[in-house]
């Protein structure tokens, strides 16, 4: 299971950073089905497999932080037996998964407050946190027109469009990326997720920058939604510079903890 998860993350089949972090955390539970002669052997296996999961995508901030937390908390628990160490792993994984899932939900609920009945929203890529925001608005009785860009080359915007089309509250239009400028002018706001924010740079799916620049040109607010843990002050290197966009184009950033104005 761990090897399969590593391969899946490396091939970008899992696209949401929260989903990646949860999958990776749960993958470590597979070590609970194995036998180890000593606690030290178990901890080495935990560290080795966690390192493999982190290396599969070094640019996912949530993946990196949750994996480091898992390993450190298990090794610092001073478990005296292998079953005890495995039990600690189960508890920490459950806690981490709950926190990641609740952060996404809280950020989505906070972002939903920016949406008013009859608004037209432009989305780019597939973000589970943006999906949380839109569905929270729908549950509150808000009807929206949603323009979903395809987000080539993986066409993840198509998945967003298909998912949203299942809700009666949404009037969904799938837009080719090259036509974003035409549709943005009629939108009330753009809403996207994030891989992370490092100092003055937003990292997200390739193609986010031109959407943000076009939104700024036509005066449409560019709202970024995600977990507070994805805002990194420094000491974290995002490896794919093609995913960057300057924070001067963003306003605001909505997280589970706060609304940040830039």
Regions found by a protein language model. Give the residues of each.
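Long amphipathic alpha-helical segments
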Residues: 1-98
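Gly/Ser/Thr-rich loops at beta-strand to alpha-helix junctions
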Residues: 18, 121, 125-130
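Ligand-binding beta-strand-loop-alpha-helix segment within the catalytic cores
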Residues: 68-117, 130, 144-186, 190
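Histidine-anchored nucleotide/phosphate-binding helix
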Residues: 127-139, 212
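Conserved phosphate- and dinucleotide-binding cores of soluble alpha/beta proteins
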Residues: 149-262
């Amino acid at each position: 299971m761990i090897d399969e998860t590593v391969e899946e993350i490396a091939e970008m089949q899992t696209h949401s950073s929260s989903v990646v972090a949860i999958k990776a955390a749960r993958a470590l539970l597979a070590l609970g089905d194995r036998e180890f002669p000593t606690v030290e052997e178990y901890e080495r296996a935990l560290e080795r497999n966690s390192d493999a999961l982190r290396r599969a995508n070094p640019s996912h901030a949530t993946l990196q932080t949750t994996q480091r937390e898992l390993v450190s908390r298990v090794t610092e628990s001073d478990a005296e037996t292998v079953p005890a160490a495995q039990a600690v792993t189960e508890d920490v994984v459950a806690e981490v998964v709950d926190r990641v899932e609740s952060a996404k939900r809280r950020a989505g609920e906070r972002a939903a407050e920016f949406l008013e009945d009859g608004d037209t929203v432009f989305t780019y890529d597939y973000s589970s946190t943006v999906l949380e925001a839109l569905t929270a608005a729908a549950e509150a009785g808000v009807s929206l027109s949603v323009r979903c860009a395809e987000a080539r080359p993986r066409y993840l915007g198509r998945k967003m469009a298909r998912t949203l089309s299942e809700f009666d509250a949404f009037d969904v239009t799938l837009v080719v990326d090259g036509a974003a400028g035409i549709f943005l002018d009629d939108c009330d706001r753009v809403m996207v997720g994030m891989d992370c924010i490092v100092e003055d740079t937003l990292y997200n799916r390739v193609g986010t920058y031109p959407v943000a620049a076009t939104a700024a040109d036509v005066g449409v607010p560019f709202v970024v939604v995600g977990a507070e843990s994805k805002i990194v002050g420094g000491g974290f290197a995002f490896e794919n510079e093609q995913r960057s966009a300057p924070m001067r184009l963003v306003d605001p950033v909505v997280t589970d903890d706060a609304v940040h104005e830039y």
